[in-house]
Amino acid sequence: MPRSLKKGPFIDLHLLKKIEVAAEKNDRKPVKTWSRRSMILPQMVGLTIAVHNGRLHVPVLVNEDMVGHKLGEFAGTRTYRGHVADKKAKR
């Protein structure tokens, strides 16, 4: 269920401050964050944000199509290695 429009987008304040500082300095280093629940705002376009996936920080280059989505959508948390082949079925 989407968030109510009257509430506005959610973004953690510490992440918003980091984004503003990085935008002022035109810093190319990734902004490291653990806030997967924060929504991508237009101010973030062009920045690289390192989103934590539970094990490491995944660099996400934000473009215009990502605005309105959550940061966690672009850093998967589960590793899929494929189904193990059944040796009897192959014979």
From Swiss-Prot:
GO BP terms in the entry: ribosomal small subunit assembly; translation
GO CC annotation terms, alphabetical: cytoplasm; small ribosomal subunit
MF-aspect GO terms: rRNA binding; structural constituent of ribosome
Keywords from the UniProt entry: Ribonucleoprotein, Ribosomal protein, RNA-binding, rRNA-binding
Entry-linked SUPFAM superfamilies: Ribosomal protein S19
Top-level taxon of the source organism: Bacteria
A Pfam family this chain is assigned to: Ribosomal_S19
Role: Protein S19 forms a complex with S13 that binds strongly to the 16S ribosomal RNA.
Family affiliation: Belongs to the universal ribosomal protein uS19 family.
Name of the protein: Small ribosomal subunit protein uS19
Organism ancestry: Bacteria, Pseudomonadati, Pseudomonadota, Gammaproteobacteria, Pseudomonadales
UniProt gene name: rpsS
